[in-house]
UniProtKB/Swiss-Prot annotation:
Belongs to the PyrI family. Keywords: Metal-binding, Pyrimidine biosynthesis, Zinc. SUPFAM superfamilies: Aspartate carbamoyltransferase, Regulatory-chain, C-terminal domain, Aspartate carbamoyltransferase, Regulatory-chain, N-terminal domain. The keyword Amino-acid biosynthesis does not apply. This is Aspartate carbamoyltransferase regulatory chain. Contains catalytic and regulatory chains. HAMAP family: Asp_carb_tr_reg (MF_00002). It comes from Korarchaeum cryptofilum (strain OPF8). One of its GO terms (cellular component) is aspartate carbamoyltransferase complex. GO terms for molecular function: metal ion binding. The gene is pyrI. The keyword Lipid metabolism does not apply. The lineage of its organism: Archaea, Thermoproteota, Candidatus Korarchaeia, Candidatus Korarchaeales, Candidatus Korarchaeaceae. Zn(2+) binds at C108, C113, C138, C141. Involved in allosteric regulation of aspartate carbamoyltransferase. Gene3D superfamilies: Aspartate carbamoyltransferase regulatory subunit, C-terminal domain (2.30.30.20), Aspartate carbamoyltransferase regulatory subunit, N-terminal domain (3.30.70.140).
Length: 157
């Protein structure tokens, strides 16, 4: 008997697929989805995947993600795909792409960096230097952020 995963289709919204296993809750937190006031959200974790071995999937009804939200997701789930659903059909499907530059989303770990000075109005800016493993560098002081640092900052863990 073939086993199937049954999750209700959404009429309009976003499906985030190919999230690395165990990171779906972080994606929800990143998007500010608590489940208390939001529409229908389906969360499936540790689903078998040919590409990843295991993966997570998030379905969000009634919401299309902004570019900034997709950029944030790419930093914690670089293998994810974003499917926009309209009238029960996939209107568009694309893989997330790591942004080459990130401004105002991450903070520098160097306490002496100008971006951490309370009297300076300087937004932290980072440049992508490696996709695998994920590493970014502060444009002001040269401090490196590793994938673990980025995930921790974006998910508040």
């Amino acid at each position: 008997m073939k086993e199937e995963l049954v999750v209700r289709r959404i009429s309009d919204g976003t499906v985030i697929d190919h999230i690395p296993a165990g990171r779906a809750l972080r994606v929800l937190k990143l998007l500010g989805i608590t489940g208390e006031r939001d529409g229908v959200v389906a969360l499936v974790m540790n689903v078998p995947s040919k590409k990843l071995g295991k993966k997570d999937i998030v379905k969000i009804e009634g919401r299309e993600l902004s570019k900034e939200e997709v950029d944030k997701i790419s930093l914690i789930a670089p293998s994810a795909t974003i499917n926009i659903i309209r009238n029960f059909e996939v209107a568009s499907k694309r893989r997330v792409e790591l942004p080459r530059r990130v401004v105002g989303i991450l903070r520098c770990l160097n306490p002496n960096c100008v971006t951490n000075a309370p009297r300076e109005a300087v937004e932290p800016s980072f440049t992508l230097i490696s996709e695998s493993p994920l590493r970014m560098v502060c444009e002001y002081c040269g401090e490196y952020l590793r994938e673990e640092d980025i995930i921790e900052q974006l998910s508040g863990v």
